[in-house]
Design a protein with these regions (language model features):
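C-terminal tail/sorting-segment detector
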Residues: 3, 465-466, 499-516
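Residue-level detector of functionally pivotal "anchor" positions at catalytic/ligand-binding pockets or at interdomain
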Residues: 339-354, 449-489
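Solvent-exposed loop/turn segments flanking beta-strands in beta-repeat/beta-sandwich domains
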Residues: 368-406
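N-terminal glycine/threonine-rich, aromatic-flanked beta-hairpin/loop signature
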Residues: 52, 57-102, 211-259, 392
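Beta-strand-rich modules
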Residues: 431-451
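Tryptophan-anchored aromatic micro-motifs
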Residues: 27-69, 85-89, 192-221, 232-233, ...
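Terminal processing/anchoring signals of secreted or surface-associated proteins
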Residues: 85, 231, 466-471, 486-487, ...
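Beta-sheet ligand-binding and adhesion/scaffold domains
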Residues: 106-199, 251-343
Length: 516
């Protein structure tokens, strides 16, 4: 066997290249090399499985492996005893099918097979493909070796219909010389999957509610039939996703691991959780993250139609591990009443303020604008505007300082953004300013039926930083850093499993695990 050279290619080197799937115009123009991957779904019977594996990937120069759970395993069986596996590499989306042959209940995937293509431009402005290949890599005490003598893996079709890899060798992504690129999967396991999304009966009473958590404010539909409550649109990317709860008096219980649908390459699940400290024995380190629970329980105010919980739920990839895209911590849901008059809105809540400095030439204010009035009733963002006050005076903003503005403005719509100095993310608003000021204030205005009602002006004192204490305690963030799980510091844009450390004004820190 040839000893495998571990060719370190960063995630940017592979991920930064345009794939043939992503650039149709460039594919049409390519003229120096025919395509070799199987990019179109082959003819035959398509089956979808719940896939698990161990996935290896290059985390900016660090070889990293993770347990992959809930991957959508697409497999095609044709009438010539051939079996095709789609996107067999969990950590590099290759838009390709690998072919195997089935004999009895054994599927054998012979390699090398073209598995990944990047589209490149040569010095003569001609497009060409660089092709990467699937090969078998053996894992042993010395590391990894390319198995050129028995370059295949086998999977067994079990009596229950599952497809399970034999042995623990890796199907790896290599260059044309057989050098491993630090992407691959082993312990492939395809389980039959037939879960369905809960559906509210047509006879259920359906109303619009608002789902709040942190700076998130999502409009959802709540349907009630008997002792069942159905909540849809909990994932903005998956409007079909529905979670079902059981009403028990003044409580509503939502069980964990409810199927929500496919989200990209993964099956998505509703997972209940609580925040806590977790020990990672692989790296002898503690970090804070969510711990899975059996259910999330909401307090239910039936008269005012409100739900509130001190726990959390996650929109999770897979159901075995905590691996989430969106988390709703301490969520609340409120019925959206039809307004009859303008009411006093809640005031702004400052998150952080960076004072203006001459060296940078700018300052930054981050604040939340609640979509509620002082009575706790939901307000539509379309009714809300806000104004900023610099050193106690209403500030007018114009194109002289804000190049993306086309006119002078002193009042902004709730969702206004110029995508340069003014940004909005849910209820969180970020505003860059170019004045050397001592205080900054925010006033919220609720307008309905031709009448406007204003909130109190919430002021942040940049000199003493007392304003933030009145609003958010000592939670001002002063720094954020990222490391990979091997302990190496990385940039905020790094893909993979990272540890995010947040440093607060009082010197305290909080470390969480994030997936990008």
């Amino acid at each position: 066997m040839k000893k495998l050279l571990l060719t370190i290619i960063s995630s940017l080197a592979l991920g930064g290249m345009a794939t043939a799937q992503q650039t149709d115009a460039a594919v049409a123009a390519a003229d120096t090399q025919p395509r070799k991957i199987i990019s179109q779904q082959p003819d035959g019977e398509l089956k979808e499985y719940y896939r698990t594996s161990t996935g290896y990937y290059n985390n900016f120069g660090t070889l990293t492996h993770v347990d992959v759970d809930g991957y959508v395993g697409k497999v095609v069986f044709d009438d010539r005893k051939r079996v095709y596996f789609y996107n067999i590499f969990s950590k590099v989306y290759n838009y390709a099918w690998l072919r195997g042959n089935i004999d009895g209940n054994i599927i054998r995937i012979d390699m090398p097979q073209a598995a990944y293509e990047t589209l490149n431009l040569d010095e003569n402005d001609r497009y060409y493909y660089t092709v990467y290949y699937a090969n078998k890599v053996k894992v042993n005490d010395d590391g990894f070796e390319l198995d050129s003598e028995k370059n295949y893996i086998e999977l067994e079709v079990m009596e229950d219909g599952s497809i399970v890899q034999r042995g623990d060798d890796m199907i790896a992504l290599c260059d044309e010389n057989g050098d491993w690129l630090w992407y691959g999967d082993t312990h492939l396991n395809y389980q039959p999957f037939d879960s369905t999304i809960p559906t509210a009966p047509k006879t259920a009473v359906t109303e619009e509610w608002k789902l709040f958590s942190g700076n998130m404010a999502e409009t959802v539909n709540v349907s009630i039939e008997g002792d069942r409550m159905y909540v849809d649109h909990i994932n903005p990317e998956m409007p079909e996703a529905v979670a079902m709860g059981v009403i028990e008096g003044d409580k509503v219980r939502f069980a964990t691991d409810q199927y929500l649908g496919q989200n990209g390459a993964y099956y998505s699940f509703f997972k209940s959780a609580v925040w806590g400290e977790i020990y990672d024995d692989r790296y002898d380190t503690y970090y804070e993250d969510y711990k899975a629970t059996d259910e999330i329980v909401f307090d239910y105010d039936t008269a005012r139609k409100r739900l509130k919980s001190s726990e959390a739920f996650l929109l999770n990839y897979g159901k075995s591990d905590v691996f989430y895209k969106i988390d709703y911590d301490k969520p609340s849901l409120k019925f959206i009443k039809t307004p009859t008059e303008a009411t006093k809105p809640l005031g702004a809540e400052f998150v952080s303020v960076t004072p203006y400095s001459q060296s940078k030439g700018w300052g930054e204010a981050v604040f939340n604008l609640p979509q509620e009035d002082v009575n706790g009733d939901v307000l539509s963002p379309s009714q809300l505007t806000y104004q900023l006050y610099f050193d106690g005076e209403l500030k007018s903003f114009g194109p002289d300082q804000y190049e993306r503005l086309v006119r002078e403005m002193d009042t902004f719509g709730y969702n206004f953004t110029d995508d340069w100095d003014i940004f909005v993310d849910g209820s969180k608003h970020t505003f860059y300013f170019y004045d050397d000021i001592n205080t900054i204030g925010v006033k919220v205005i609720n307008t309905f039926g031709g009448k406007s009602v204003e909130s109190d002006i919430v002021t942040y004192d940049l000199a003493t930083q007392t304003g933030i204490d009145d609003v958010a305690g000592s939670s001002r963030v002063t720094g954020v850093s990222y490391t990979n799980i091997a302990g190496c510091r990385v940039g905020a844009g790094t893909k993979g499993i990272l540890l995010k450390t947040v440093t607060y004004q009082d010197g305290s820190t909080r470390t969480v695990k994030v997936a990008r």
